[in-house]
C-alpha cells in the first residue's frame, strides 16, 4: 500500500506558467500541486510536494523519503534529468518506486535533452503530456495500492 506519495519538482519548475509557456504551458506549479493534493486526499492518501532549484536539496528530500512513510515518488528532475548522477543515486538508494515525468517531450527537443539518467531505474516515464502527465503518474501510483 502506498502510505504517502512524494512529488519532487526540479530546477526552474517554480516558474511554470511564466517560463516558455509555448513549451511548458500556462499551468502554474501551485495549480499542479493543488490538483494533485486534492486527488490524493480524495483517495485518502497523503501527498507531499517539494520543489528546489538546488540539486543538494532535492537529494536531501529524496533521501528523507526513506524514513518518512513515503511509498512512491513522482519526480520531474527538469534539467537535472540530463546531468545528475547524484540525484539518480539518491533515488536508487531509496529503493522506492518512482515515475519520471516531463511536461515537454524531451525527445522532440534539443539533442542534449534526449538522455535521461533516470529512465532506466524508473517504473515508468511520462513525457510530453503537459500538466496532465502529473495526474497520470498519480493515477498510476494510486493504482499500486
Curated annotation (Swiss-Prot):
Binding-site list for substrate: 76, 82, 89, 103-104, 113
Keyword Transmembrane attached: no
EC number(s) given by UniProt: 4.2.1.10
Pathway(s) annotated for this protein in UniProt: Metabolic intermediate biosynthesis; chorismate biosynthesis; chorismate from D-erythrose 4-phosphate and phosphoenolpyruvate: step 3/7
Active site positions, chain numbering: 24 (proton acceptor), 102 (proton donor)
Keywords of the record: Amino-acid biosynthesis, Aromatic amino acid biosynthesis, Lyase
SUPFAM superfamilies for this protein: Type II 3-dehydroquinate dehydratase
Swiss-Prot/TrEMBL site (Transition state stabilizer) positions: 19
Catalytic activity: 3-dehydroquinate = 3-dehydroshikimate + H2O
Broad class of enzyme this protein falls into: lyase
Pfam families membership: DHquinase_II
GO BP annotations, alphabetical order: amino acid biosynthetic process; aromatic amino acid family biosynthetic process; chorismate biosynthetic process; quinate catabolic process
GO molecular function, a single term: 3-dehydroquinate dehydratase activity
Domain of life: Bacteria
SUBUNIT field: Homododecamer.
Homology family: Belongs to the type-II 3-dehydroquinase family.
PANTHER family referenced in this protein's UniProt entry, alphabetically: CATABOLIC 3-DEHYDROQUINASE
Main function: Catalyzes a trans-dehydration via an enolate intermediate.
Protein name: 3-dehydroquinate dehydratase
Organism: Nitrosomonas eutropha (strain DSM 101675 / C91 / Nm57)
Species classification: Bacteria, Pseudomonadati, Pseudomonadota, Betaproteobacteria, Nitrosomonadales
Gene field: aroQ
Amino acid at each position: 500500500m502506498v502510505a504517502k506519495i512524494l512529488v519532487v519538482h526540479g530546477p526552474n519548475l517554480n516558474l511554470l506558467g511564466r517560463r516558455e509557456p509555448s513549451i511548458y504551458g500556462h499551468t502554474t506549479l501551485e495549480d499542479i500541486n493543488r490538483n494533485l493534493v486534492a486527488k490524493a486526499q480524495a483517495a485518502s492518501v497523503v501527498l507531499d510536494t517539494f520543489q528546489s532549484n538546488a540539486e543538494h536539496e532535492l537529494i536531501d528530500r529524496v533521501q528523507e523519503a526513506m524514513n518518512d512513510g513515503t511509498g512512491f515518488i513522482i519526480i520531474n528532475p527538469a534539467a537535472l534529468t540530463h546531468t545528475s548522477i547524484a540525484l539518480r543515486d539518491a533515488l536508487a538508494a531509496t529503493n522506492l518506486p518512482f515515475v519520471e515525468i516531463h511536461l515537454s517531450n524531451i525527445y522532440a527537443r534539443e539533442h542534449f535533452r534526449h538522455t535521461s539518467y533516470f529512465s532506466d531505474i524508473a517504473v515508468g516515464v511520462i513525457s510530453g503530456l503537459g500538466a496532465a502527465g502529473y495526474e497520470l503518474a498519480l493515477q498510476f501510483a494510486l493504482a499500486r495500492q
